[in-house]
Amino acid sequence: MHGGVTASTVQFSPTVPNMSPITDAVVLGGNGGLVFRWSGQKCCAVQVELNYMQRGWREANEEGAYARALHYIELPFLMHIYFGSPTVRGFVNLGPQIGYCVYDNSGIGTKQTSEVHQYNPIEKPFDWGIAGGLGFYVRSRKAGLYQLEVRYNYSLGTLFDNSLSAHFRNSNPMELSVNLAWLWEFKR
C-alpha cells in the first residue's frame, strides 16, 4: 500500500488568462492505493497499482479565485527497473495509466457561468496517459520494503471536448506526486 501528496494542474490550449503564473494553477491533494509487483527477472519487474488520486486546478484574478477538485480512480501498469544491493535499491517506473473521474465539484470561488468554458462540468471523465517515476527502497528482513517515489503523470486524454468546433484544443491534466509505500514480499 502507498500514499502521498499530489501537486496537479491542467494544461489548457488556448491558455486560460487567469492561470498565467504556474503557482496559481497548482492544486495540492492526496493519493493512496494498493501496489502489486511481480519480479520474475534479475533487474526488472511488472507493477500494477489501484489508486485514488485527487487532482484539480486553480485560477486567480481581480474578482477572486476559482478552484476545481477532481477525484480519480487510477490503474497504472508500470515497468519497474531496479538496481543496487539486495538491501537498498534505486528504481525507475514507466508505463501507461488509465483512470476515471468519480468526483467533480463544480468549483469554489468566483461566479461560474457557462460562458467560461473551464467552469462547465467535465465532458470526458475517462483518462489515459503516461506515468514515470524515480525512487528507492530499503528492504527490512521482517517488515517488508519501505519505498519513496517521485512520479510524474501526463494525461493524453482531455477533460473537455477537443473537436475542431470546441473551445479548447487541449485540456490535459498533469500531476507530480511524492509517495511513501510499504510492501510485503511473498516468496514462491
Question: Where are each of the predicted segments found?
Answer:
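Predominantly the C-terminal beta-signal and adjacent terminal strand-loop region
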Residues: 49, 122-132, 136-188
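Short glycine/serine/threonine-biased micro-segments
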Residues: 2, 27, 31, 93, ...
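Residues that define the transmembrane beta-barrel architecture of outer-membrane proteins
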Residues: 24-30, 69-73, 88, 124-130, ...
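Extracellular loop and loop/strand-boundary signature of outer-membrane beta-barrel proteins
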Residues: 17-22, 60-66, 114-122, 163-170
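Gram-negative (and chloroplast) outer-membrane scaffold detector with strong preference
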Residues: 5-11, 36-110, 140-142, 176-185
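Short glycine/proline- and aromatic-enriched beta-strand/turn motifs that initiate or cap beta-hairpins
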Residues: 1-33, 183-188
